[in-house]
Curated annotation (Swiss-Prot):
Descriptive protein name: Long chain base biosynthesis protein 1a
Keywords: Acyltransferase, Endoplasmic reticulum, Lipid metabolism, Membrane, Pyridoxal phosphate, Sphingolipid metabolism, Transferase, Transmembrane, Transmembrane helix
Enzyme class: transferase
Species: Oryza sativa subsp. japonica
Membrane-related topology note: Single-pass membrane protein
Principal place of residence: endoplasmic reticulum
Keyword NAD: no
UniProt catalytic activity: L-serine + hexadecanoyl-CoA + H(+) = 3-oxosphinganine + CO2 + CoA
Amino acid sequence: MDMALPIVNATAAVLARVSAAFNAPFARAVVFGVHIDGHLVVEGLLIAVIVFQLSRKSYKPPKKPLSEKEIDELCDEWEPEPLCPPIKDGARIDTPMLESAAAPHTTIDGKEVINFASANYLGLIGNEKIIDSCVGSLEKYGVGSCGPRGFYGTIDVHLDCEAKIAKFLGTPDSILYSYGISTIFSVIPAFCKKGDIIVADEGVHWAVQNGLHLSRSTVVYFKHNDMASLANTLEKLTRGNKRAEKIRRYIVVESIYQNSGQIAPLDEIVRLKEKYRFRVILEESHSFGVLGQSGRGLAEHYGVPIDKIDIITAGMGNALATDGGFCTGSVRVVDHQRLSSSGYVFSASLPPYLASAAVSAVSYLEGNPSVLADLRSNISFLHKELSGTPGLEISSHVLSPIVFLKLKKSTGSSNTDIDLLETIAERVLKEDSVFIVASKRSPLDRCKLPVGIRLFMSAGHTDSDISKVSSSLKRVSASVLSDYI
């Protein structure tokens, strides 16, 4: 409106001047008793111009259709763009196909191999009691739940599983999700919104990164597992910032980092959380059922009261030999997700037989705590056996079931590094029938930690399995990395 007013005024002034110019010659003109002035002349001219423009025929360029020969030439010359960009050699993934369950021993291409590439920490894949519970659930409920939890998808076994997990961890309530990685990237956006502040470890895995992105919050990263960096980041965000005191603030960390095998120092994180008045979201997919005297996770490992952690999430596929995930915490935290978490509201609920498997697995862990001792013994033995591996070094924590081997000397190129590591993994599988994997990352993954070889330890592995993978890695890495040692 402010810009249009001067234009209208200028137009009116021009018309007034033109009318005044015509008023003088026609000051005394009278036609059929009507006084003729400049306004009538100008308006008459405008009407004539409008009629002329409307009566003109629109311009149409002459039609010159293409001949059959020209059409054929154009078709021959046309080169369509590819539907997707070509895959570079470094991005190609030729994943071995398992032909049996992902137990400590599995089958690939008809040959039995030792499996260090699948997370089966408690060795429960193939457990007879868990299989029997699944069969009974299938006979009673069928395969699927046929709907989301809020729309005829809630089965009594879902409620039993939620109650079992909450009781096991000592929390007021818990909530089930139908897919492991969808748990964390649904929970984060359910609580964190645009304008909120999230401080996250730079080493979090892709599912956590996706949740951070979907939240649209302001995300600030601190150095991997560096509490001094976390303290400095929290200080900068809160010092003299009155606005920060009025908005929601979160710290997001993993208990055991999938990209490094390191364990987060929860006691120090809780101290900083209370000092700067942040909330903590803890992702426990690789520590639930593993850390702590009875497998209750990172809080039990550090002796931190579990109510000090605001939100805990975990996938159940790593320790419980099932699928799905859960979030646990206060009743208020859980109830909020039943209406606000996309992975819960808009996804079909966890198949009942998988919930039954989770209940049986937790019961097995409660009744057989010795399985944790077996797992820790295997991890310790593997660390000992892998010491002195040419060109590789262990960077993971001594209690982590993810034993992470990285290059002692990087080539300076992540693509070259991953090529070397994949060559090692391929030769170990081909020559010694030991299945291991390199930590290859998607182009969408923003984690910049060093790549490496991940060995997933299981309580079901034997000493001979561990000795074989160690000797194979030493022999093959000495050959592949001979120019880099």
